[in-house]
Amino acid sequence: MPKVTVYNQTGSQVGEIELAEAIFGIEPNEAVLFEAVVMQRASLRQGTHKVKNRSEVSGGGRKPWRQKGTGRARQGSIRSPQWRGGGTVFGPTPRSYAYKLPKKVRRLAIKSALATKVVENNIVVLEDLVLNAPKTKDMVAVLKGLAVEKKALIVTADVNEAVELSARNIPGVTVITADGVNVLDVLHHDKLIMTKAAVEKVEEVLA
């Protein structure tokens, strides 16, 4: 079982915690991580693209000129795709790009993302994270005590409004709950900061 140092809010070591081998100690599966990231990014696409086809563009319904006798190519409508201002054929229409990987694959991807942070030594476990009031400077002090200078993902066991409000104005810092742990957020941030309660909750969900 991988062991990680536990810190308090001031950055002092207060002990160690053994992380679940089946979650934090597995060999990261890069192929599954790739598939999970592609899936998440696809679901973030708006899909609001739209062009008009020949039934939607403006223009008359009458035949531009008679069929025979003019010497010109026969035409049936000025809304045909070969005309300037005509409709588009097989153009993009509004659609959802979201899709889901199998549940086992999604769970393996999250485990692989968490294990990656352990391998890189980029996971920090806090004994607890308690802020009396939403103040950005208090959160900055916590991060400074933990020597976190890059992008950080803070995972709490439950919704903590004071923590969320204190971190939202700090560039590169994101706060989520243990239920919302996902591959894209974990990999996007350099440091993963979890409370002990959050670790226990994640292990309970992914066990």
Swiss-Prot record:
Keywords: Ribonucleoprotein, Ribosomal protein, RNA-binding, rRNA-binding. One of its GO terms (cellular component) is ribosome. It comes from the Bacteria. InterPro entries: Ribosomal_uL4, Ribosomal_uL4-like, Ribosomal_uL4_dom_sf. One of its GO terms (molecular function) is rRNA binding. Part of the 50S ribosomal subunit. HAMAP family: Ribosomal_uL4_B. One of the primary rRNA binding proteins, this protein initially binds near the 5'-end of the 23S rRNA. It is important during the early stages of 50S assembly. It makes multiple contacts with different domains of the 23S rRNA in the assembled 50S subunit and ribosome. Belongs to the universal ribosomal protein uL4 family. This is Large ribosomal subunit protein uL4. It comes from Bacillus cytotoxicus (strain DSM 22905 / CIP 110041 / 391-98 / NVH 391-98).
